[in-house]
């Protein structure tokens, strides 16, 4: 009987394929900012937003100019970090970098659409920076209409360190806002799901109807509004007027020297 030795090859190759799938993602780096610094272009800002997908709450955009000599250790795409890690890095970023935040309310999102509202907030965040940047990196496909050069980077929050820092600031700020909204709108669980369309949120919508903080263009919200008609529309309170984050400096911040390479 002749054995086919090639039949064993897939088994030998299998561990290699598994290793490729389990490989850790490359962390965001400061290389693009460093390249601009070498060309004499500074300050350089990164900006990103949080909250494009939820059924409720605002879109929060952040812009960050990192200090090349004081970069906190551990900055990365906010989606790769735990809530605890994001909170700690938020404080360190605000203590060492120039930071600004802008918020697009649900009313603006309904009026302008989610893309335009997001771009509006991103531009306002850049304009609100304490120092005007000479170059801006923005996450996504769309460049901003800024006074300086703007470079859109797809997946930028996992590539460009300044964008990653902005993603952390935007995410933490929005999460805190949603926890505050939970106090005004009990029963919806905003503090848990942050406005996303999880089953618990959809159930609350069906039982209680939408609030002024829900985005009407989403089908579940529109359906809940129709069910609970006639709907008494309360005056919309602009809870999101602030465009800048107040920062509190920390005495000691761990610096990531490797990020400066």
Curated annotation (Swiss-Prot):
Disulfide bonds: none annotated. A divalent metal cation binds at residues 48-49, 139. InterPro entries: RNase_HII, RNase_HII/HIII, RNase_HII/HIII_dom, RNaseH-like_sf, RNaseH_sf. It is found in: Cytoplasm. NCBIfam families: PRK00015.1-3 (NF000595). Manganese or magnesium. Binds 1 divalent metal ion per monomer in the absence of substrate. May bind a second metal ion after substrate binding. Endonuclease that specifically degrades the RNA of RNA-DNA hybrids. It is an enzyme of class 3 (hydrolase). Residues 1-23 are annotated as: Disordered. Keywords: Cytoplasm, Endonuclease, Hydrolase, Manganese, Metal-binding, Nuclease. GO terms for cellular component: cytoplasm; ribonuclease H2 complex. One of its GO terms (molecular function) is manganese ion binding. It holds the Pfam family RNase_HII. PROSITE patterns: RNASE_H_2. One of its GO terms (biological process) is mismatch repair. Its EC number is 3.1.26.4. Its main location: cytoplasm. Residues 1-20 have a biased composition (Basic and acidic residues). Residues 42-230 form the RNase H type-2 domain. Its cofactor is Mn(2+); Mg(2+). It catalyses: Endonucleolytic cleavage to 5'-phosphomonoester. This is Ribonuclease HII.
